[in-house]
Amino acid sequence: IKFDGLSRVSHVTDATDWRVEMPFVVLTPDTEAEMAALVAGCVELELTIIPRGGGTGYTGGAVPLTWKSAVINTEKLEAMSEVEMLSLPGLAQPVATVFSEAGVVTQRVADAAERAGYVFAVDPTSAEASCIGGNIAMNAGGKKAVLWGTALDNLASWKMVTPEAKWLEVTRLDHNLGKIHDVEVASFELKYFDATGKKLERSERLDIPGSTFRKEGLGKDVTDKFLAGLPGIQKEGCDGLITSARWIVHRMPKHVRTVCMEFFGNAKDAVPSIVEIKDYLFSQSQVKLAGLEHLDDRYLKAVGYATKSKRGTLPKMVLVGDI
């Protein structure tokens, strides 16, 4: 429990660099089990609770807006497993999974998957600094989302503390091991436990049409915070505090090539290529598009991009695809 100036100042802002107020206190629980009691104490003291992981977010979710706030930093919740083959509800065959607490850095899960010959699909550019809890709260994704979706699509289950300082466990049923919007109905089991996490108080089942999780022509809809009432995901910590999760990991195809495509001329003529390339590769039965990253001319100038073409000028756009 930290009241010192350094701890409070270092929790004033996140990657946004916005500053409004210093938090009253910073809490760094040692174990997942401590979370519910900390939330209960903050509620009793009428402190606004701000969950924080790596602080890499660009939406200001970890920025205190009032002095009467408590930042709960999950950085010490670092327990995780190697790849484990588990039987998931509704599936006949065991599935490769990785368990991780909320404070585990994203890249560590990716490394654990790679050691066993698998791939962790949630790969934001902040993977070296962001944490698992934030990935769930933001429904994070990266270039592999083209093939396997965002955090929501790759979760087998997750655990969180509710605003009532009680425990909630959410489990995906009949997981399709792919993008959630490809299924007609996505089902989840919600189990509500008391403050000790041992006594089951009630349970319910959510059956949500898969199409509601994506916006037609857009994909992930960042404006949809309610997300059909599914707890924790994409809520930015507003409906509870994520403490741990179990992820599905995937096998990469045997052969992978990274292709760099440079586009010159008018950018408006090049942009439709993104959709055309995606549609073309999705129509091929033996080929998968594992990722597609778009870099515009401003980004290319900023990173000092070295043109592969002999034209001698910077491209208007570069696409990097994993095929």
Name every feature range the model reports, one short phrase each.
Residues 1-40, 57-97, 125, 248-249, ...:
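N-terminal flexible segment immediately upstream of the FAD-binding catalytic core
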Residues 41, 150-152, 162, 311-314:
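Acidic/histidine-enriched ion/cofactor-binding microenvironments in catalytic or ligand-binding pockets
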